[in-house]
Amino acid sequence: MLAEQKLAELISDALEGLAQDIAVEAHASIGGLYDGDEVAAIRERTIHYLGGLAESLRQNDPDIFLAPVEQGVRGRLANGFTALSILSYADTAEAALLRLAANASGDPYERNRYIMSIRAMIGRSRSLITNTSKQWLAEQKTEAEQKAEGKQPTA
């Protein structure tokens, strides 16, 4: 029970840290650039991505987070986060991760393996989402600049 409580704290702290990091990143990169509809669309893509993670966890497959990142996974990555979207996911993720750890509770080596999988998932998610967000935002800015140049009258 004490080990599960410690694991719950680890997961909760990691998810809260991830939520804070991504909320700061989203406000810095998205704030002021997009209107409410565009931010809502980004939030929907975020929920879709997190739903995919939750489904993988429900299938008791933590190794998916240790595998090389495939193009299909990148295609589902959200272009930004809001604190609300990830915090609404945290309860589902925490419950699923605790079930994974409970499955390995008989073997300390396996429990540690699951904890490392969780850490890898959170670290990889933070890195991929941040990098993908920055790349996507740069592409959007370039497209907007090109459209603006195309609309300007030529002298």
State each model region's role.
Residues A3, F65-A155:
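Long, amphipathic alpha-helical coupling/dimerization segments that relay conformational signals between
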